[in-house]
């Protein structure tokens, strides 16, 4: 049953990531869909950390697997981010690649912290 929960969550997360991926062509070197997926995933995992820490006993263990491992794992994408950064670096756009790394890391960590602390205020 665990594998089904993870697989279903991953399918939903990947579908949302594919929809967000449609935003990628809107900016020359910042793939907005990938950035949006990672920042949204960071926000949601921060929230989920609090929910499952404070009220984890209220949820079936498969729900946590569905949300955190499945959905958020399917939504966020380190491999796509890595390939986009590599493409910039490989084409000589070193500064753009470094900026993209900084933007992803800073925004995603900030979103995770925001999700965590805002959810703690509500719980």
Curated annotation (Swiss-Prot):
GO terms for cellular component: plasma membrane. This is Fluoride-specific ion channel FluC. The chain crosses the membrane at residues 1-21, 32-52, 66-86, 94-114. Keywords: Cell inner membrane, Cell membrane, Ion channel, Ion transport, Membrane, Metal-binding, Sodium, Transmembrane, Transmembrane helix, Transport. Belongs to the fluoride channel Fluc/FEX (TC 1.A.43) family. One of its GO terms (biological process) is cellular detoxification of fluoride. The lineage of its organism: Bacteria, Pseudomonadati, Pseudomonadota, Gammaproteobacteria, Moraxellales. Fluoride-specific ion channel. Important for reducing fluoride concentration in the cell, thus reducing its toxicity. It is found in: Cell inner membrane.
